[in-house]
């Protein structure tokens, strides 16, 4: 056990602040301190914890001592059970749970029996929040994500014709989303078009489209290689025809693309849906990056999502939630907007965003 439970001394506030009960949080993750050389996965969980501690420091003037205790699961159910037998564990108001289903189940049962909130931010497909009132599911479940993205896109398609682009003999990996969107369009009597191309989209494949139209192109695949086979043809056709209004709609995976792919996404005024997004040039991002570098002497891993920012945003939500039941927080990378899943159930994070890559390298992030 790595103990970080010493309460941070609150800063002297500008105005009197009512002293609140201490907040105590257990962070239970596979830090793998038993390994001579920690794996990349273990290093990412350590980065998450470091970001979480920056959030603790940012909130230390709230009038309540904040206690954080880190427990290393070492990837073992036994270690989780061992932590629960520690009498000091009873002081915790909330648990940040690990990414293992068996370990989460043990902690969720403990939370239910002891009225302790269990925050699950790593197991996206876990469903324990549906039957356990103590579980807070940190990600919008996939089925609800597709529905929410589809409904939001339907509003944007009111004055645009959707054009679905697929490849002959190939199955796109977004068949479920595309099928749901087509069904919604059909139910509302909206027309859409299908274009199936052989190997690569050419401008000639689009010449049947009236040039005075307004089109939203929607690939049936999220793969970068497939996107690169589509965008140049759309750009060429648009530039030749001059008059059509053209935009592109896509998927969370696209937020990771860089180089020429990203340039073309900006060119085509691309919008994607995603549970999270980091605007690297935003002042808030720069501020956290600077604090992380100052505190720990290195930078966060260049990954998607960035675990240090996930830890920071998680702390910035969880601590105010424990203090005064704040149910929302729009973070640097991850937002938290919790809603109950029903009677006798826990809650889940309803946050979903549209990320718009506009011409001129402009990026806009808006909550759906």
Regions found by a protein language model. Name each.
Residues 1-23:
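Sec-dependent signal peptide cleavage junction
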Residues 45-68:
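Signal peptide-proximal N-terminal region
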Residues 96-166, 170-178:
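Extracytoplasmic ligand/sensor domains, especially the bilobed periplasmic-binding protein
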Residues 231-308:
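Extracellular/periplasmic periplasmic-binding protein-like sensory domains
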Residues 26-27, 90-100, 119-122, 161-168, ...:
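Periplasmic-binding protein-like
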Residues 77-93, 204-212:
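Short, well-structured alpha-helical segments in soluble
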Residues 298-308, 312-367:
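Segments of small-molecule ligand-sensing domains
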Residues 36-50, 171-175:
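Glycine- and acidic-residue-enriched helix-capping/strand-helix junction motifs
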